[in-house]
């Protein structure tokens, strides 16, 4: 799910609309809006229906100009995380971006950005969860960051890494970062991190909280 407050103070709560208890159940994307701080909510609004394909892991980002970006993954019909393949053709995960300029009342048609944000060797990729951010300070002020994760390898050699989708033009074009480093000084990536969230701290540093994809420790924090 993704929950944001727009520049006009409207609450937008968006999530997967599931018909079955399954991550990949031909999910739609559905939304409710609140203009009174959450005391009352609109009727359920269908934002995106991909037919038998599945919409997963929606992430909204509120931009300084009031636009709301919606980033989500599209999995082929009946294909789960372990069943999609690397690359950009065939049975692959795809990534799409929509936007709203009226506080979520209407939404644009989706723009596919898969080749911009998906590493070619990644077997599966997805976003979030939660919300993206737009940097408020520093040399990259205005940059949009969406937390993402990638699954690389096969069988017992599978690893997951956190990274970010990056836009410097308000979401028109994107590129992706390298995997987030572990921070031990050896340049190695932060291993086995899947769903993650990003915030910008008051001193300009970025903090990421991530879910451990396997192992005894459920969550990690990275500065």
Regions inferred by a protein language model and the residue ranges of each:
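Asp-box/BNR beta-propeller blade signature and adjacent active/binding-site loops
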Residues: 1-223
